[in-house]
Regions:
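A carboxyl-terminal module marker
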Residues: 2-169
Length: 169
């Protein structure tokens, strides 16, 4: 991927589409690979095993190839993915009731991994939460040195009824 419209989250979305199709749950950890832009790359882990990386190519590396646009790359070990694949389709009842989405932005220290925040949300025991995703990470003067704002989307639903605001607050 490349260009002004491409970003880390678009690339991550492509990878997550593959993981969803294979019934795999990925965890993303900050990558230290030297050819990836610091803070814009992630190692991909599934089942405690690193199966690849994704992220923005470091601008110095792109410049070595006379490329002046942002470049994004991913490498995944397909043999490892297929070995981890749970196989078989998993079916569950669709809810007849509308899901409720909530967005939340949290200012955290730069060293807090967004993937760890998603894992904490998913393991929180929130009764009706069906997904937690990071959709933006902002760094800037308004946030402060050594800090970042992580924006997350949470989806809540029930197969038996419409949820109230109190149930998802």
């Amino acid at each position: 991927m490349y260009g002004a419209d491409a970003d880390f989250f678009a690339l991550k979305g492509v990878a997550e589409g593959l993981f969803d199709a294979l019934h795999l749950k990925a965890v993303y950890r900050a990558s230290s690979l030297p050819f990836l832009h610091p803070g814009r790359g992630a190692d991909v882990e599934i089942g405690g095993k690193t199966v690849g990386y994704l992220g923005e190519i470091h601008p110095d590396v792109a410049a070595d190839y006379d490329c002046d646009v942002r470049l994004y790359a991913a490498e995944l070990d397909l043999d490892a993915l297929f070995a981890l694949c749970k196989g078989g389709a998993e079916f569950r009842e669709f809810s007849k009731f509308p899901p409720v989405e909530r967005d939340l932005a949290v200012v955290v220290a730069e060293n807090v991994a967004a993937g760890d925040m998603v894992a904490a949300a998913e393991n929180s025991g929130a009764e009706h939460m069906t997904s937690a995703e990071v959709f933006d990470v902002y760094r800037g003067a308004q946030i402060g040195e050594g800090m970042k704002s992580v924006a997350m989307n949470f989806t809540f639903s029930s197969v038996s009824r419409t949820l109230t605001d109190e149930e998802i607050a």
